[in-house]
């Protein structure tokens, strides 16, 4: 098989590049599933359901909406609602939203930065393999006898080119998927910020209904 043959011709540097590729695939699949499925939540539908229960004064219903949608957004809002149920001040509610965001945002951004690192390191590993292959080629030209010179020169060039190719084969998808995941993470964080502000303003505009007092 062409890929297997190319891998063996690439020399020792192919193994760390392969390891980086395996890690890249694992992180990519895991983060794509988490960010696009497990953490997915329609913010407008969620906020509409939430305000319906808020206007009714149905505290159990509010928490049920959050529990039925176990996404970072709903978890942040749930911390706010718990503080509301406990008759916190507007400052307490704002602090609860901030606390919830500080807990959930790192979960959204988790592992994504590793893909950028893998992309850079895989490129450098490929470059290092290229350099070692070229060293082998120059050594063949300088030191080897005529009988082995052609074989060593071919081996060195093959090692250099295969390392470059495999390094880029890992680096390019890593960088592309990093960009996709980073964009998705920012979208989820923006949703948290938007719905947090909308919920906080909604509570303040119905201060008397919920018994929310101003901070001293």
Task: Specify the residue positions occupied by each region the protein language model found.
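Alpha-helical transmembrane segments of integral membrane proteins
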Residues: 14-27, 116-123, 129, 170-174
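Pore-lining and gate-forming transmembrane alpha-helices of multi-pass membrane transport proteins
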Residues: 151-178, 182
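Residue-level signature of catalytic and energy-coupling elements of molecular machines
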Residues: 11, 25, 62, 77, ...
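Loop-to-transmembrane-helix entry motif
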Residues: 10-14, 104, 108-122, 156, ...
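Predominantly long cytosolic amphipathic alpha-helical stalk/bundle segments
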Residues: 40-128, 132, 136-146, 180-216
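Hydrophobic membrane-targeting segments
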Residues: 1-46, 181
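Charged/polar positions within long, soluble alpha-helices
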Residues: 34, 162, 166, 201-204
């Amino acid at each position: 098989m062409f890929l297997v043959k190319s891998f063996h011709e690439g020399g020792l540097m192919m193994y760390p590049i392969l390891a980086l590729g395996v890690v890249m695939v694992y992180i990519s699949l895991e983060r794509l599933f988490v960010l696009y499925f497990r953490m997915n939540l329609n913010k407008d539908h969620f906020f509409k359901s939430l305000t319906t229960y808020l206007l009714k004064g149905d505290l159990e219903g509010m928490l049920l909406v959050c529990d039925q949608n176990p996404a970072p957004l709903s978890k942040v809002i749930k911390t706010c609602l718990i503080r509301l149920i406990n008759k916190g001040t507007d400052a307490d509610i704002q602090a609860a939203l901030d606390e919830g965001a500080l807990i959930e945002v790192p979960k959204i951004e988790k592992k994504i930065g590793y893909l950028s690192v893998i992309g850079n390191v895989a490129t450098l590993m490929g470059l290092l393999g290229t350099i070692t292959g070229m060293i082998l080629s120059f050594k063949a030209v300088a030191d080897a006898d005529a009988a082995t010179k052609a074989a060593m020169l071919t081996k060195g060039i093959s090692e250099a080119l295969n390392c470059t190719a495999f390094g880029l084969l890992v680096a390019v998808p890593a960088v592309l998927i990093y960009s996709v995941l980073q964009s998705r993470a920012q979208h989820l964080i923006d949703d948290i910020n938007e719905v947090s502000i909308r919920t906080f303003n909604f509570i303040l505009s119905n201060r008397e209904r919920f018994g929310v007092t101003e901070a001293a």
